[in-house]
Design a protein with these regions (language model features):
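Membrane-interface helix-loop-helix junctions at transmembrane boundaries of multi-pass membrane enzymes
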Residues: 100-108, 205-213, 257-261, 295-309, ...
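Hydrophobic, aromatic-rich transmembrane alpha-helices
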Residues: 21-22, 195-201, 292, 370-423, ...
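Membrane-lumen/periplasm interface segments of specific transmembrane helices
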Residues: 130, 306-395, 494
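Membrane-embedded, hydrophobic transmembrane alpha-helices
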Residues: 1-99, 480-513, 522-533
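Transmembrane alpha-helical segments
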Residues: 120-123, 280-281, 483-543, 553-584
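Perimembrane helix-loop-helix junctions
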Residues: 283-315, 509, 513
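Short periplasmic/luminal acceptor-recognition loop of GT-C membrane glycosyltransferases, typified by
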Residues: 584, 588, 592-629, 646-657
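Transmembrane-helix signature of polytopic, membrane-embedded enzymes
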Residues: 34-44, 183-184, 200-225, 242, ...
Length: 701
């Protein structure tokens, strides 16, 4: 009961601080963007995300990275925004009502509401009300966040992937930091996906694309396995695509506005993009370079210097903490990648020999590109696949020809150069083909090769739809019909996948089978939840007069629903956590395993020498767990054990993963019986206790 009371108390603090932050950020955003709902929403989310990263960076640098400090700092920033920026006088953003426009506008808004409602229903069903099951989320996205909370230290090295940039993980931290468990971690990418829809819509508005085609483009981007899977996980490829389109959209607004205002929002998007993951640096540099070229051509050196100064400042403030941390702790900002010419040790080549051939630029051939094309068609569907291929193809003539001969088509040229640059980044991205030389394991799984290029798919889709809208007349009408048919097929296919009716695409179906208990459950609840959420949205939009008169009653009702949801999530999370993961891994619960291995009642330090070790941390994040990065030799195994001084070591009997990172650990344990007390548990897992720990427990003080 105490845990539930704690979670409810934290909810009150969280709601107050976030309310202040969002309202203050909205006032700042209102000064930067037009009076439109999607534009204001997108700008507000970018500002809120930037504030979250900025607060975490400074509190982590000062050694005060605690949930209470973090949340109170956000509240202070929100209060300051409200004091500094007065409310706008142009009223409520347009686009709120559903049934008051023409038939076409009504259909567009109904379609938009259903699309957003289906995404929210998907997250609530498979993200919030289910335990995390995604491989990368269990391996490092969630453990990183839990280690931050356990140690109140942004620089701790307890996770093997401690070195990755963490701007997207900070979104997870924002949702779960003060709670007793990670039961709201499934909300991480919901607002990232909604931000993607908003910036795609805004980018197409700048291209003067009709509303129906804008809706089709949003459906095309969202009805993909990348969005469907990452909506309910903590992966960050969706964030890369979102921030790429966001930076492009806001940067073009700055260029088209004759650079009257500083490009705050575009620079924030660039800074956030730099801090998502390493390959996102390439996409960020593409946007910086293309915008600098356009600014130089239209505004001269002064505009270019303004743009570059804003970008560098944003990168330092919003991403500098990650690269500075790596440089400080390991001597290279891109650890484990080093640069021998600069005197930086390169551990990446030792960890992944032959990894330079995992890019399409060096390792691609006709057969690989054929498999990649099928992977894109399967994972992204016909409309997104066609839009991506079309966008990449038309970017070359548009970018080269219209740059000189058609100055009125500058926006298409802008999108074309971004697409060309993104294509170059994708073909140079590591691990698209494989993570282990000669296996083509990533390409065989299809999904991973596609998710690394989802940012390219997003910007190419925007270019494709903008090009179709630009071609007026019969050609444009024909292309519009083709696009509409493909989008319809795409949406139907992915909807049937979500409802468990078909096995297409393969990887997404496998993921859904591991989440839903059976197809009947998905078939019944997924459309039901979608319709319910859409109805709530319709009622709220059409009864704003009633809501304004009964705001107190509506607020109390919403708060009551939130409190009930928090209490239920907290109780369910802790009650079934151990049993869920033990059944999933076909093993006893970790608590019983630890109790059997230890000889006293102290809380042990556990060294996890396997990949998906999230469940070992416990539902309350109560266990002290470390996962080493790389142990290529038996001496390295001994060195890691000596460094971390674990009470228990947990590993597999045989490491069957492609990289064989922990293959030598069971061999070391088997070959040194004098150093370990071995304990076999549940087939796959090997649990060992160092004898010096056992002896220290037995000796009386």
């Amino acid at each position: 009961m105490f845990v539930v009371v704690w979670d409810l108390s934290w909810t009150v603090l969280w709601a107050v601080s976030v309310g202040l932050l969002v309202s203050g950020s909205h006032r700042f955003a209102a000064l930067q963007v037009p009076d439109r709902l999607t534009s204001r929403f997108a700008a507000t989310l970018v500002v809120v995300w930037s504030c979250v990263v900025l607060v975490a960076s400074f509190s982590g640098f000062l050694g005060m990275f605690h949930p209470w400090v973090f949340q109170l700092s956000l509240a202070v920033i929100g209060f300051a925004f409200r004091r500094w920026f007065p409310p706008t006088r142009n009223g409520r953003p347009t686009g709120m009502r559903i049934f008051s426009k023409s038939g076409r506008q009504r259909a567009v808004r109904l379609g938009s509401a259903l699309m957003v409602s289906s995404m929210i229903a998907h997250v609530l069903m498979y993200g919030v009300s289910r335990y995390p099951v995604d491989w990368d989320s269990l391996a490092y996205h969630l453990p990183i966040v839990d280690h931050w909370i356990q140690t109140a230290d942004l620089f701790n090295q307890r996770c093997a992937f401690w070195y990755v940039p963490g701007n997207n993980e900070l979104v997870t931290y924002f949702w779960v930091a003060g709670y007793s468990g990670d039961f709201f971690a499934g909300l991480t990418n919901l607002f990232v996906a909604l931000l993607l829809l908003c910036v795609v819509n805004e980018a197409l508005i700048d291209a003067r694309v009709p509303a129906v085609m804008r809706l089709a483009a949003c459906f095309s981007v969202s009805a993909t396995s990348v969005v469907s899977r990452q909506l309910i996980s903590q992966e960050n490829d969706l964030a890369v695509a979102t921030l790429l389109v966001s930076a492009a959209c806001f940067a073009w607004r700055w260029l088209a506005d004759d650079r009257q205002r500083l490009p705050y929002l575009a620079a924030m998007s660039i800074g956030l993009l730099f801090g998502i993951k390493y390959y996102a640096i390439g996409y960020a540099l593409v946007v910086v370079g293309v915008v600098a070229a356009f600014a130089l051509r239209t505004g001269g050196w002064k505009s270019t210097a303004t743009w570059l100064t804003c970008c560098v400042t944003a990168i330092v403030l919003l991403a500098g903490v990650w690269y500075g941390r790596n440089w400080l702790l390991e001597g290279t900002p891109l650890f484990p990648k080093g640069f021998k010419a600069l005197g930086m040790a390169d551990q990446w080549d030792a960890m992944r020999p032959g990894n330079r051939f995992s890019t399409l630029m060096r390792g691609g051939d006709a057969e690989i590109f054929r498999k990649l094309s099928w992977a894109w068609a399967e994972q992204d569907g016909p409309s997104t696949w066609l839009a991506t291929m079309t966008g990449v193809c038309v970017s070359i003539p548009i970018g080269l020809y219209y740059w000189w001969s058609k100055p009125k088509q500058n926006y298409l040229v802008f999108l074309a150069w971004l697409t060309l640059g993104s294509t170059c980044v994708y073909v140079m991205t590591p691990n698209v083909i494989e993570t282990v030389f000669g296996t083509q394991n990533m390409l065989a799984m299809r999904y991973h090769s596609v998710r690394f290029g989802f940012a390219l798919a997003a910007i190419a889709t925007v270019l494709c739809f903008a090009t179709v809208a630009w071609h007026r007349g019969r050609l444009g009408q024909f292309l519009g019909i083709v696009v509409a048919v493909l989008v319809g097929v795409d949406v139907i296919l992915h909807a049937t996948v979500a409802m468990g009716l078909t096995a297409w695409p393969t990887m997404f179906r496998i993921e859904m089978k591991s989440i839903a208990r059976d197809a009947g459950e998905a078939w019944f609840f997924w459309p039901l939840a979608t319709v319910d959420i859409a109805l709530i949205y319709f009622i709220a939009c059409e009864s704003k007069g009633w809501l304004s008169r009964h705001m107190r009653t509506a607020g109390i009702a919403c708060a009551g629903l939130v409190f009930v949801g928090v209490a239920y999530a907290s109780l369910t999370w802790h009650r079934q956590y151990e049993s869920f993961y033990s059944a999933r891994d076909t093993r006893p619960t970790w608590q019983s395993t630890i109790d059997a291995a230890m000889v006293d009642e102290s809380e042990p330090r556990i060294m996890a020498c396997f990949y998906r070790y999230y469940s070992l941390l416990g539902s309350y994040r109560q266990r002290d767990v470390v996962r080493p990065l790389y142990m290529p030799t038996l001496d390295a195994v001994q060195q890691e054990i000596h460094q971390w001084q674990p009470d228990i070591i947990v590993t597999f009997h045989e490491d069957r993963h492609w990289t064989k990172t922990y293959a030598l650990v069971p061999e070391w344990i088997q070959n040194h019986p004098e150093a370990f007390r071995q304990r076999d548990t549940a087939g796959r897992f090997l649990v060992a206790v160092p004898k010096h720990k056992e002896m220290s427990h037995d000796v009386s003080p």
